[in-house]
From Swiss-Prot:
It comes from the Viruses. GO terms for biological process: symbiont genome ejection through host cell envelope, long flexible tail mechanism. Gene3D superfamilies: 1.10.246.150. GO terms for cellular component: virion component. Keywords: Viral genome ejection through host cell envelope, Viral long flexible tail ejection system, Viral penetration into host cytoplasm, Virion, Virus entry into host cell. CDD domains: gp6_gp15_like. The gene is 15. It comes from Bacillus phage SPP1 (Bacteriophage SPP1). This is Head completion protein gp15. It is found in: Virion.
Amino acid sequence: MDIQRVKRLLSITNDKHDEYLTEMVPLLVEFAKDECHNPFIDKDGNESIPSGVLIFVAKAAQFYMTNAGLTGRSMDTVSYNFATEIPSTILKKLNPYRKMAR
């Protein structure tokens, strides 16, 4: 999956996150394949990632690269809490593509 496509989906117009996305996007695609028990291979043997999975990858990358996972913040003595797991609102994008595990 091309990181430029992920950048377009997230409206990222600079190169600030390119290194991160180059590493993270393939990991998230692999996560989606494992989670769905689906290799996303078409009849010709080429990888074919459905649009919902593309959205999952983009949103999950955004979640991990920004403070989108911020769950709490204190002002006195400064304290931040972050969620470390992908939220169910993002994970549910994979539901239509899940197959039963064999």
